[in-house]
Swiss-Prot record:
The keyword Transmembrane applies. It catalyses: a ubiquinone + NADH + 5 H(+)(in) = a ubiquinol + NAD(+) + 4 H(+)(out). It comes from Elephas maximus (Indian elephant). Core subunit of the mitochondrial membrane respiratory chain NADH dehydrogenase (Complex I) which catalyzes electron transfer from NADH through the respiratory chain, using ubiquinone as an electron acceptor. Essential for the catalytic activity and assembly of complex I. Keywords: Electron transport, Membrane, Mitochondrion, Mitochondrion inner membrane, NAD, Respiratory chain, Translocase, Transmembrane, Transmembrane helix, Transport, Ubiquinone. It is found in: Mitochondrion inner membrane. This is NADH-ubiquinone oxidoreductase chain 2.
Length: 347
């Protein structure tokens, strides 16, 4: 892609997200979402082939449908309340339709079907943007709407997302699809805690983005996209294999790594609000995710194929210009748990 065109696209993507996050008026927020959607399409089609074209088409049709639903909800709310303010979504029908539209944009269940297909059809870098940056704008709107949303609908979507995110990833061999189902599962945790403590939703989002960025950068640097290619990682890049192993354990929420922090705080918040069954169900369903993370670790770190000494030395001569951010990301991905008391004090 032309560097000038790419810089313009990325600037527009950043601006669209920023407009939505800073908006208190529904019309400007909707405009930011549309900028975000339209600039994401050429990013998905960075390499022109039938699979990326199909993925971009699916993304466009799903997001356009969600945008129409959102505009319909805004119109209904305007008719009944005369308000364009995001925090004044008082009409229950408009609130429910807007909630479903934003859930579709986020890719949470039962509106999740486009996420694995689109992620699998594109390269690792567009997939990384899709599963990280594209969550910011819709979730910022849900954060502002938290007071007026239908909590039962949020709980249902959250529990379904955790279940489907774990269940769907069990039988996958493609890493992009596994990370897509992981994204759906994490989105379920964020949605469930939203009515109780929106700040914890933002904390979970920040740590999820940090972990997902780390994994995608490791996979991009080792040119790994499937489980079969994971088995060669230890022979080629042992250092990155160890990084991948610890980051996957952190993504699964295993103590004492960073990914345990939001799960610990969210379960504590739910039990503090006399909700016992829900956090127990969430923790049990998350074991499905832990299973396929462990399977990835087994293939990458615990299975070593026969190799020659020449093959073992290749990791010393690989191009390292794209790995400058990795040490910082990996450190943050694995060592934030000691800061948990400070985070609790800030709530």
């Amino acid at each position: 892609m032309n560097p000038l065109a790419l810089s313009l696209i990325l600037t527009t993507l950043f601006t669209g997200t920023l407009i939505t996050m800073m908006s208190s008026h529904w019309l400007t927020a909707w405009m930011g979402l549309e900028m975000n959607m339209l600039t994401m399409i050429p990013i998905l089609m960075k390499t022109t082939n039938p699979r990326s074209t199909e993925a971009a088409t699916k993304y466009f049709m799903t997001q356009a449908t969600a945008s129409m639903m959102l505009m319909m909800a805004l119109t209904i709310n305007l008719m009944y309340s005369g308000q364009w303010s995001i925090t004044k979504m008082t009409n229950p029908v408009a609130s429910n339709v807007a909630l479903m539209a934003l859930m579709t944009k986020l890719g949470s269940a039962p509106f999740h079907f486009w996420v694995p297909e689109v992620t699998q059809g594109v390269e690792l870098t567009p997939g990384m943007i899709l599963l990280t940056w594209q969550k910011l704008a819709p979730l910022s709107l849900l954060y502002q709407m938290a007071t007026y949303t239908n909590t039962n609908l949020i709980y249902l979507s959250g529990l379904l997302s955790i279940l489907i995110g774990g269940w769907g990833g069990l039988n996958q061999t493609q890493l992009r699809k596994i990370l897509a189902y992981s994204s759906i599962s994490h989105m379920g945790w964020m949605l469930i805690i939203l009515p109780f403590n929106p700040t914890l939703t933002l904390l979970n989002l920040a740590i999820y983005i940090l972990l997902t960025l780390s994994i995608f950068m490791i996979l991009a640097n080792t040119f790994t996209t499937s489980m079969s290619s994971l088995t060669l990682m230890w022979n080629k890049t042992p250092a990155m294999t160890i990084m991948l192993m610890t980051t996957l354990l952190s993504l699964g929420g295993l103590p004492p790594l960073s990914g345990f922090t939001p799960k610990w705080l969210m379960i504590h918040e739910l039990t503090k609000n006399n909700s016992i069954i829900m956090p127990l169900t969430m923790a049990i369903m998350t074991l499905l995710n832990m299973y396929f993370y462990t399977r990835l670790i087994y293939y990458s770190s615990l299975t070593i194929l026969p190799s020659t000494n020449n093959m073992k030395m290749t990791w010393q001569f690989t191009n390292t210009k794209h790995t400058m951010m990795l040490p910082t990301l990996i450190t943050l991905s694995n060592m934030l748990l000691p800061l948990t008391p400070m985070i609790s004090m800030l709530e």
